[in-house]
């Protein structure tokens, strides 16, 4: 609930600031498999298989936890289904009432530095008051008290994704029902690979992570494989270059996409290209680098950012002082 609450708060601020609709997609209810850069992990002189996500093994650094267990797939499925049911109930049952979301934001800025936050909330307050005066409110307009919320994750664990794929009896098309939107990771985007082949065959909107090693000609080939009909909205290209590499690599890819007349959505993932390892061994991202990549992306163009309502170590402002 808290995760959805924060996402609704953020989307309201973005909608008000940009005067544009915001599509709300959460990496939730299914992200239980993790790509790893190495097959093993070392700690205190001991080497064990890498943690591959709760779909496969456990995070605890002990030999028993790192043994793959197929029963985890059933638990992951049950967890995903429960989460999706809750999201559906919250998003359609009044939790997303525009007035309530606005009150959450007002509570957020109450004890904080005013400035730009208060300016945005004043703008939203004026808009809501104007609509109320015109007789438009959540009580008589369902769209103001409900929200369309979509789920997403990387289509990494192919046996699981395949088991969740169904045929639409009216069209004969295949849909991966594990999420609304699935993507192909930067490590699994080989044109002749199984992940590209799987995503090519489903009708879900799909994403493709684009990193520094992706050549322009490879991108064109992948676009033609994944979206042969050049359908608008089918393919999202998710850049993850790192703060210092965006302006070096992204313009070249954008230019070749424009030249070929390909219809894609550009998105930015400023998290995974800025990963560093702190002295404690935790992977984290300096917030300054995250913000820099977002700014550089917009300087050339939606963006994706990991967020949490909990205290986390995945992103810090001063990573050098990270000690927990």
Name every feature range the model reports, one short phrase each.
Residues 2-242, 285, 293, 309-324:
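Active-site-facing alpha/beta catalytic cores
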Residues 219, 228, 234-268, 272-313, ...:
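Non-transmembrane, aqueous-exposed alpha-helical and coiled segments at domain scale
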């Amino acid at each position: 609930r808290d995760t959805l609450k924060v996402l609704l708060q953020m989307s309201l601020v973005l909608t008000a600031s940009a005067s544009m609709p915001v599509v709300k997609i959460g990496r939730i209810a299914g992200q239980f498999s993790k790509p790893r850069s190495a097959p093993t992990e070392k700690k205190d002189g001991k080497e064990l298989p890498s943690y591959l996500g709760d779909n496969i093994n456990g995070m605890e650094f002990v030999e028993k936890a790192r043994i793959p267990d197929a029963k985890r797939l059933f638990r992951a499925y049950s967890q995903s289904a429960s989460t999706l049911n809750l999201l559906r109930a919250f998003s359609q049952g009044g939790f997303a009432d525009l007035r309530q979301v606005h009150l959450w934001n007002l509570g957020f800025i109450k004890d904080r530095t005013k400035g730009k936050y208060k300016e945005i909330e004043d703008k939203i307050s004026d808009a809501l008051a104007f609509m109320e005066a015109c007789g438009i409110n959540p009580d008589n307009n369902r769209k103001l008290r409900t929200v369309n919320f979509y789920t997403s994750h990387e289509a990494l664990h192919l046996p699981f994704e395949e088991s969740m794929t169904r045929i639409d009896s009216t069209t004969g098309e295949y849909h991966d029902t594990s999420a609304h939107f699935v993507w192909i990771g930067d490590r699994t985007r080989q044109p002749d690979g199984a992940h590209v082949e799987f995503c090519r065959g489903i009708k879900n909107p799909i994403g493709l992570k684009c990193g520094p090693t992706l050549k322009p000609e490879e991108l064109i080939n992948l676009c033609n494989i994944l979206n042969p009909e050049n359908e608008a909205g089918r393919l999202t290209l998710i850049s993850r270059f790192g703060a210092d590499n965006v302006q070096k690599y992204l313009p070249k890819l954008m230019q070749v996409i424009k030249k070929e007349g390909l219809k894609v959505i550009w998105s930015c993932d400023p998290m995974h290209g800025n990963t560093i390892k702190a002295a404690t061994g935790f992977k984290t991202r300096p917030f300054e680098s995250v913000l820099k990549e977002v700014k550089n992306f917009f300087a050339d163009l939606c963006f994706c950012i990991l967020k949490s309502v909990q205290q986390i170590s995945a992103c810090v402002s001063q990573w050098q002082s990270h000690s927990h």
